[in-house]
């Protein structure tokens, strides 16, 4: 019997659409064809998020910038809520779920109006208590939260905040994550999945894994450790301009990840009988027979 939950694969498109709606829709289509369950984006209010100094400063990596300043760069990559509504409708037409990470309260309330199945909070914002309260109190769907660059006291505050209205067990999903782009294998720390399962598994709905690493081998191990929700950044071309493309999977990589996760899921079981049906004929032909 297989007690593992079925793999749930999230294609994190994020800002890899490069500010172009047609590329975003193309990536949704490719994510669906590659076996993803969700096409996920991001929503930010850059004026609220960035200080005036940050907004007007140059991008730290000018080769990846889409504007003269970091603020202009972020605005270029930002979709309006009307475009997000269009993307959600397109996802529904294709039969793939739409989801979005939100970075601030304004964005959270805008995305809540679209009523997606879940809304995600990135590691950078998981200590924004007011943001978490808005998602807890004004939204009925699942709230997914990454805990990269987060200490145990901060983790406990997140769980407790949702337990305060008894919604953690029904609605809260916590993701093991290391915040880096890309993350070297030694810093992925997969055993954190086991720790999160042991400490919070009976207090939250589920434990996931958000990976910023290269390749797909690590994701197989993450799944076997109990993280059936796997999130990976997704792009059409890893050489495209932007900071996230290099740590993303291309369609062929996502397709292989989906294939391999499902293969591992199907194989994780005990034998239902001592000699399986597939073995019986081989046993008759090959098993040593004593005189």
Where are the regions that the model predicts?
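Catalytic cores and adjacent flexible loops of soluble metabolic enzymes
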Residues: 1-291
